[in-house]
């Protein structure tokens, strides 16, 4: 597939209808081991045949080289090699071009299969079950035939390959010890980064690991505030949500928050690696107030600061 596989990816704009449906579309692929892997379609710009790469000195682990494609010079990661799988370079014959937090990169894989649509409540976090894959898989879902699909944790892959970006200097918020941000993300890398930003801002924080857990905790807090005759906004000044999460995604979580009067006045900020205009449109459809791409700590603090002062 040297050409762009538009027949496979179709129109991304049409997929904005998924907002609030608690569904996602997964592109299935293999790395030559018989296992099936998946990645969110929204992360993929195109699929093409693997092409000759240029090697540069001191390339990170798992990076086979760089390639020039449609005006972009992008690093190309060999997923089989990155995951410690003994596979010949020739067997990795397809390349998925992904956009992640405004960065574009290629993933070499053995074969790209098809796109499936799944409910987020059928996606389960792996916890520590897949330590053999170095934490590079963060969720599982089951196909109709009973076979499992491992969902790649792109955030962890990129941190493992390229390291973590420094958050930078973040000013403390006046009276921050009396302010609180509730955040939810299924990625341990993301939670660590968010916590670092909030710590530097000097504000209190509460967190959950997926949308379902977040909504359960938020409902309990809302019920407690209501019983006490208090406003929940006095306890939580902002809610930060990821887009992709097992069991309940950030779009459905936002819908729940925005349709519940007890959360009136609490802004919802979507903090996501899905940085395309289509994803922003999906967020707006369900009531997201602000959008911040991962992992720009300064942008995150700049977005939260006026919300905390309100």
Language-model-detected regions and their locations in the chain:
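An acidic, low-aromatic, low-complexity terminal/linker signal
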Residues: 1-230, 234-239, 243-252, 259-267, ...
């Amino acid at each position: 597939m040297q050409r762009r596989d538009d027949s496979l990816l179709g129109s991304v704009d049409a997929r904005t209808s998924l907002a609030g449906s608690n569904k996602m579309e997964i592109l299935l692929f293999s790395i030559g081991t018989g296992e099936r892997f998946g990645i969110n379609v929204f992360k993929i710009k195109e699929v093409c045949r693997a092409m000759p790469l240029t090697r540069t000195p001191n390339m990170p682990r798992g990076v086979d080289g760089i390639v020039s494609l449609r005006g972009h010079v992008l690093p190309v990661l060999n997923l089989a090699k990155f995951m410690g799988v003994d596979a010949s370079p020739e067997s990795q014959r397809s390349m998925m071009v992904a956009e992640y937090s405004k960065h574009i990169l290629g993933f070499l894989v053995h074969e790209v299969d098809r796109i499936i649509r799944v409910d987020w409540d059928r996606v389960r976090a792996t916890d520590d079950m897949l330590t053999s894959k170095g934490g590079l898989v963060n969720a599982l879902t089951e196909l109709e035939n009973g076979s499992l699909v491992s969902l790649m944790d792109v955030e962890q892959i990129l941190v493992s390959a390229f390291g973590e970006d420094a958050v930078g200097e973040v000013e403390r918020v006046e009276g921050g010890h009396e302010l609180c941000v509730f955040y939810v993300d299924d990625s341990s890398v993301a939670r660590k980064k968010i916590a670092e930003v909030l710590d530097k801002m000097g504000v209190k924080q509460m967190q959950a690991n997926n949308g379902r857990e977040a909504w359960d905790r938020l409902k309990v807090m809302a019920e407690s505030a209501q019983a006490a005759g208090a406003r929940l906004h006095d306890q939580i000044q902002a809610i930060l949500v990821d887009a992709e999460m097992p069991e309940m995604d950030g779009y459905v979580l936002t819908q729940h928050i925005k349709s519940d009067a007890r959360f009136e006045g609490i802004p919802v900020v979507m903090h996501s690696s899905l940085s395309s205009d289509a994803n922003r449109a999906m967020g707006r459809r369900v009531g997201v107030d602000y959008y911040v791409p991962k992992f720009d700590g300064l942008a995150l603090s700049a977005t939260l600061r006026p919300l905390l002062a309100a």
